[in-house]
């Protein structure tokens, strides 16, 4: 994971993540191979903010059926990034 744009896939904007933004916590979908240090470095480099801590959650792929054929959806990894108190806000979430 060299390029930070390979680590962060997209922001996740839901009702719960919008409530967490008031506490300076932002939610991203990240690469399944990325660790907490890589996520922290990527957020700091892309958005120019200071990260206090990173929490990650792994989601298994779900089994899906189309007729008699079964398959699996992709597994996912979600990161909740908390910024320091003196850090600025991330503008991408302020729409």
From Swiss-Prot:
Gene3D superfamilies: 3.30.70.330
GO cellular component: ribonucleoprotein complex; ribosome
SUPFAM superfamilies: Ribosomal proteins S24e, L23 and L15e (SSF54189)
GO process terms (BP): translation
GO MF, one annotated term: rRNA binding
InterPro entries: Nucleotide-bd_a/b_plait_sf, Ribosomal_uL23-like, Ribosomal_uL23/eL15/eS24_sf, Ribosomal_uL23_CS
Cell inner membrane is among the record's keywords: no
Annotated keywords: Ribonucleoprotein, Ribosomal protein, RNA-binding, rRNA-binding
Similarity comment text for this entry: Belongs to the universal ribosomal protein uL23 family.
Function of the protein: One of the early assembly proteins it binds 23S rRNA. One of the proteins that surrounds the polypeptide exit tunnel on the outside of the ribosome. Forms the main docking site for trigger factor binding to the ribosome.
PANTHER family for the chain: 60S RIBOSOMAL PROTEIN L23A
Subunit structure as annotated in this protein's UniProt entry: Part of the 50S ribosomal subunit. Contacts protein L29, and trigger factor when it is bound to the ribosome.
Protein name in the entry: Large ribosomal subunit protein uL23
Organism annotation: Bacillus pumilus (strain SAFR-032)
Organism placement in taxonomy: Bacteria, Bacillati, Bacillota, Bacilli, Bacillales
Name of encoding gene: rplW
């Amino acid at each position: 994971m060299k390029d930070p744009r390979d680590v962060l896939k997209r922001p996740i904007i839901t009702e719960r993540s919008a409530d967490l933004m008031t506490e300076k916590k932002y939610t991203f979908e990240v690469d399944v191979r990325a660790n907490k240090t890589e996520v922290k470095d990527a957020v700091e480099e892309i958005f120019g903010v200071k990260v206090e801590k990173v929490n990650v959650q792994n989601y298994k792929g779900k089994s899906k059926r189309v007729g008699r054929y079964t398959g699996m959806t992709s597994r996912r990894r979600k990161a909740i990034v908390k910024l320091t108190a003196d850090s600025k806000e991330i503008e991408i979430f302020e729409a």
